[in-house]
Amino acid sequence: MWLEEIIVGFDEHWELQKYEDIAEMLGRFNGAYLAGLPLPSEPWLCRGFLQSWTHECDKYDSGIARLEETWNQSRVKGLLPDGTFERYLSFCQNRDLLLASLEKLPKVFTHNDAWRPNLFPATDRGLTMIDWSNCGLAGVGEELGRYYGLSLNSDLGDLPDKRALANEMAIRYCEGLRKAGWRGDDHLAKFGFMASAGIRCGMMIPNLLEQLSRLPEIEEIPAKWKERCTVAVHLLDLAEASIELAGGAV
């Protein structure tokens, strides 16, 4: 077995700048396959990873998030804004539209599991990634969407201005695509980013409601639940924005 020695260490704390820098590095990595580098064709590569992951999550969805009585519980009302139930149902009805639209995007080679434990940025603006077990082909922007969604879920849930970070990451990712030589439409990459990140709300919201329903009645909800709910609503915002784009010409 051949293994690469990773010289850089694991940095326990990342400034927002580092998250943004990595977004650009991922753009350079993906963009190379839009600028002439041949896509790999090995039969074992993951194809349709997001669709497969979404349908796998469905197996563990009890349907609790599609029941109005769930949303009428006092603890749920205190954590999620009015109207979120109707918005979530609309998302569920349009999810397949998003998945179909993602399939139409220009394809790139992707790591498919880019998040902090698998990323080792170097001081020379290089990036080493480990755990390539899910690598494969996906639409431009999907890599960034998964990176962003996983980052919110693991490290940045308490970030006050998530929209600003999403916008900056999208800009930096597109800059990386340009530096790699791609001259295509940035809107395609931004759609891929928003849609793939937003689809995570379809897993996160049912999971949140399932766990909240098991919590004992307490006077104050722990801060971590409030943070996770703000993340879920933000991802729903991204999903809705991408659904609007998918309804027209993506």
What does each model-identified segment do?
Residues 5-111, 217-224, 239-242, 248-249:
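ATP-dependent phospho-/nucleotidyl transfer catalytic cores
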Residues 7-12, 130, 150-159:
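Glycine- and acidic
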Residues 33-42, 177-187:
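Surface-exposed helix-capping loop/turn segments at secondary-structure junctions
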Residues 92-142:
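Active-site acidic catalytic loop and adjacent metal/ATP-binding pocket
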Residues 141-180, 198-217:
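Active-site activation/catalytic loop segments of kinase-like enzymes and analogous catalytic loops
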Residues 182-199:
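All-alpha amphipathic helical-bundle segments outside canonical DNA-binding/catalytic cores
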Residues 195-250:
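ATP/Mg2+ or Mg2+-diphosphate-binding catalytic cores
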